[in-house]
């Protein structure tokens, strides 16, 4: 899976703030089962990948998984024990900005109990409270 954008217009971004709920990406589009965020957070590319791997390992063949979020925000960090000033730190990792209501993963092609189990394992990898939802 692609863990960061191929190219961006600017190397560094402001942190911004997460207010309100997600109006886009809050409906199931591709699969039958989904994992929905209940809290706002930054989810790193590593966390997204860990969740995807956990789900894939759990459903094995048969199931199809869609990742509905993409880490497109660079997070900068200053080197440790560095004095303040002399500009902004260098980009260290990428995050996806997630608001409440956003669908993180979708799944289809498996029984509900298997999907519930796989999605709960993926949910434990996330830094936020989530819920399992079924389309229809």
Swiss-Prot record:
GO MF terms held by the record: rRNA binding; structural constituent of ribosome
PROSITE patterns, per the entry: RIBOSOMAL_L16_1 (PS00586), RIBOSOMAL_L16_2 (PS00701)
Biological process per Gene Ontology, one example term: translation
Subcellular location: Plastid, Chloroplast
Keyword Ribonucleoprotein: yes
Domain of life, per lineage: Eukaryota
Main location: plastid
GO cellular component: chloroplast; ribonucleoprotein complex; ribosome
Alphabetical list of Pfam families matching this protein: Ribosomal_L16
Keywords, alphabetical: Chloroplast, Plastid, Ribonucleoprotein, Ribosomal protein
Subunit description: Part of the 50S ribosomal subunit.
Alphabetical list of HAMAP family matching this protein: Ribosomal_uL16
Family: Belongs to the universal ribosomal protein uL16 family.
Name of the protein in question: Large ribosomal subunit protein uL16c
Native organism: Citrus sinensis
Gene: rpl16
């Amino acid at each position: 899976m692609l863990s960061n954008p191929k190219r961006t217009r600017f190397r560094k971004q402001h942190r911004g703030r997460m207010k309100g709920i997600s109006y886009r990406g809050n409906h199931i589009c591709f699969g039958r089962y989904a994992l929905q965020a209940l809290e706002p957070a930054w989810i790193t590319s590593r966390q997204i990948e860990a969740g995807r791997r956990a789900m894939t390992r759990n459903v094995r063949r048969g199931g199809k998984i869609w990742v509905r979020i993409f880490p497109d925000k660079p997070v900068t960090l200053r080197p440790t024990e560095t004095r303040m000033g002399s500009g902004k730190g260098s980009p260290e990792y990428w995050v996806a900005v997630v608001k409440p209501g956003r669908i993180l993963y979708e799944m289809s092609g498996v029984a509900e109990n298997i999907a519930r189990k796989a999605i709960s394992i993926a949910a434990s990898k996330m830094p936020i409270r989530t819920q399992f939802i079924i389309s229809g």
